[in-house]
Amino acid sequence: MRLTPSLISCLSLLHFTSALVAFPGAEGFGANAVGGRQGEVYVVSNLNDSGEGSLRDAVSQPGRIVVFSVGGVIEITDRIVVSKQVTILGQTAPGDGITVYGNGWSFSNADDAIVRYIRIRMGKGGSSGKDAMGIADGKNMIFDHVSVSWGRDETFSINGDVSNVTIQNSIIAQGLETHSCGGLMQTDGGVSLFRNLYIDNKTRNPKVKGVNEFTNNVIYNWGGGGGYIAGGSDGESNVNVIGNYFISGPDTSVTAFTRGNENFHAYVETNYYDSDKDGTLNGSELGVDSTNYGGMDLVTEKYDYPAVASVLSPDDALTYVTKYAGASKVRDSVDTQLVAQVESYGKDGALISDEADMGGAGDLDQGTTPTDTDGDGIPDDAEAELGTDPNTADSMDLDTSGYTFLEVWANSLVPSSYA
């Protein structure tokens, strides 16, 4: 279902959108993504792979805010390609939310994407040599509380002419063997990685080149390919690495940081490493010495990149990530197992070649489709609370905050901060 917004002056709209972050709690290089705020609403009303009311159809055209009137697993055959200026609000799905299973997604050239609270699980049946999520060009994107797993090449990768991207509060897990990679983060345009969990990837947790802010992440059970891999190339990289926790798992056989050189310039601060796999969390701070950071060129001043509002200690980052990372409005069976692995502190975890080892995508409660008399994406009971008219399609009108009423409702469904 598609509706155009009520008439609003372009000047007013541009004023509001330029001053807003993507949603309350958006941080980093991608914080000012606009998404579909200047477009129309599309309600995903079924779990079909394609056709009217499907998620694939929803993201196929630019300028849309996508909400859900159904929860469950969407099984796809071909990759989903996302258009420009699309907002995907998975937290609006009833029941246990949305999982997309069977192949990967491309966000290449999907400028101003906003993606929240959704699970993207590729699997061994997906396209060979492709990422579960990939960006090969584009700008101004933010991914928040996304669970991505089972990529056949990388799990979540960013390459090429890409600028201003944030991945925050997310889980990047279990790239499938024999490749098993967390992802490449290789652009000079700026990537922020905040409060994410990298888990059960043999290598590239992540592999970084260019401009990167890496703060309050948890990295668990990387394999012999490496944890945080510096570029290892002639190109210049300039990064901040702050407040992260690296925890060795059963498959870990190399140190947390590898492949740095004189061209990889890093400001590092308060990063912890628990290497003993003894089932007890007892990591200690890595000394600020190049040998502890894989031969990086360590600098003394932090790069002036868009930072998190509040930097957590590594211990607090671990607590936060295990409680809230991923599509955590309702944790599914896969993410629940992954978090349990982390909390074994070295005893549990595995590199896998088949998602069947995790029970596959699992089953989700589809929930109950809410009553939405005017079909504008906001349920009637929520319209009463917002003060909007349940008989008039006004969800894309602007609230005094500058967000559409649709965004105001969706933002109210989840915390802006989990502090």
Swiss-Prot record:
GO cellular component: a single term: extracellular region
Gene3D superfamilies cross-referenced by the UniProt entry: Single-stranded right-handed beta-helix, Pectin lyase-like
Keywords: Calcium, Carbohydrate metabolism, Cell wall biogenesis/degradation, Glycoprotein, Lyase, Metal-binding, Polysaccharide degradation, Secreted, Signal
Function of the protein: Pectinolytic enzyme consist of four classes of enzymes: pectin lyase, polygalacturonase, pectin methylesterase and rhamnogalacturonase. Among pectinolytic enzymes, pectin lyase is the most important in depolymerization of pectin, since it cleaves internal glycosidic bonds of highly methylated pectins. Favors pectate, the anion, over pectin, the methyl ester.
Residues modified by glycosylation: N48, N164, N201, N282
Pfam families noted in UniProt: TSP3_bac
Biased composition (Low complexity): 363-372
Reaction(s) the record says it catalyses: Eliminative cleavage of (1->4)-alpha-D-galacturonan to give oligosaccharides with 4-deoxy-alpha-D-galact-4-enuronosyl groups at their non-reducing ends
Binding site for Ca(2+): D274, D276, D278, T280, E285
Protein name in UniProt: Probable pectate lyase C
Signal peptide limits: 1-19
Family annotation (InterPro entries): EF_Hand_1_Ca_BS, Pectin_lyas_fold, Pectin_lyase_fold/virulence, Polysaccharide_Lyase_1
Biased composition (Acidic residues): 373-386
